[in-house]
Design a protein with these regions (language model features):
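Residue-level marker of positions within ordered structural domains that often coincide
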Residues: 50, 74-75, 141, 154, ...
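Intrinsically disordered, low-complexity segments enriched in serine/proline and basic residues
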Residues: 6, 15-17
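...with weaker cross-activation on analogous glycine-rich loops/strands in unrelated enzymes
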Residues: 90-165
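N-terminal capping segments
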Residues: 20-102
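Glycine-rich, aromatic-bearing surface loops/beta-hairpins
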Residues: 150-202
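Short hydrophobic transmembrane-like helices used for membrane targeting/insertion
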Residues: 1-3, 13
Length: 202
């Protein structure tokens, strides 16, 4: 189901939440799983696939910008950051960000976490379970995954040719997943977004 609500990034450069007033999931706190706005995530991906939102640093020259872009899309669809030190998922500026915001492996660990905290949550899934707004991660060589494209089109895909992605480093939109030469693929389905139970509706 696609939920139509104003995304925090839809019209460019909305200010980020203040971490001093951040929403952290504390052990025992009430968290509600709410729908992920897939349409907002995909619209953001299309808007910035070949550009750079000036509210975010461009990591192209220092390791790549793919997971930074993926996190921006996730934020567009979730509307909340997790300012938990070290293990959270947030961006304040180029130097103040969580490892999960820009790191392929760290983002995977964050999305599939068991720790209760606010923010998007996901699980590894099969190719046919991918939906627009989900992520795929690719391993080209070595033992670690190195790329985090965003799914912009998929409908019970039976092959990677039927999954289209947007990405940074290298910039792409509507690119068939089959066009990548990778050794391993993992698919991440976003199940929803954890919010404090008392927070206003998205």
């Amino acid at each position: 189901m696609i939920i139509l609500h104003p995304s925090p990034l839809r019209k460019g450069v909305a200010p980020f939440p203040n971490p001093r007033h951040s929403l952290k999931g504390k052990e025992g706190s009430a968290l509600a799983l709410r729908p992920y706005d897939r349409q907002a995530a995909v619209l953001y991906a299309h808007e910035w696939a070949y550009g750079r939102n000036p509210k975010f640093y461009d990591y192209e020259r220092i390791g790549g910008d793919c997971t930074n872009f993926a996190s921006q899309c996730l934020f567009a669809g979730s509307g909340i950051m997790d300012f938990t030190p070290t293990f959270g998922w947030y961006y304040i500026d180029a130097d103040r960000k969580a490892p999960a915001w820009t790191g392929v492996q760290y983002l995977h660990q964050y999305l599939t976490r068991e720790r209760p905290s606010v923010g998007p949550v996901g699980k590894e899934c099969q190719l046919w379970e991918l939906r627009p707004g989900d992520l795929v991660q690719l391993r080209f060589q070595g033992e670690v995954f190195q790329h985090s494209p965003v799914v912009v089109q998929a409908d019970h895909a039976q092959s990677t040719e039927e999954v289209l992605i947007a990405a940074h480093s290298y910039d792409a939109d509507y690119r068939p997943l089959s066009s990548y030469g990778y050794e391993e693929l993992r698919c991440l389905h976003i199940e929803g977004v954890r919010w404090p139970g008392s927070s206003p509706n998205l």
